């Protein structure tokens, strides 16, 4: 009886470790895997898909605070955005757009509207949507 239990545990251990080491390209396994965005990401180099994220330990307190404010549930709220801008000023980077009344959607041209649409979708922070928004912004500056 001990041999059967021991063999079963050994078998489950080997199987689970094999599953754990398998790398999965999630873009091949979603419901809309045929969508162009998933096809582009799936065909991308594995290094680009499985890249390493920056570690919080390697960031200073302002970078950590910026990430914390941006990733909160209500991170787009005015208070959080002001805190992000404050931390960016403390870091010395002036990448924050000036605060002022934004242009209405009706006053924007087609590329501006497309960039805004890509960024404000449910998954607007995903790579393909960000890439498309940047492409539309490049079209703005080019023409």
From Swiss-Prot:
Residues 1-20 form the signal peptide. GO terms for molecular function: metal ion binding. Transmembrane segments: none annotated. Keywords: Metal-binding, Periplasm, Plasmid, Signal. It comes from the Bacteria. GO terms for cellular component: periplasmic space. It is found in: Periplasm. Induction: By silver. Component of the sil cation-efflux system that confers resistance to silver. To E.coli PcoE. This is Silver-binding protein SilE. The lineage of its organism: Bacteria, Pseudomonadati, Pseudomonadota, Gammaproteobacteria, Enterobacterales.
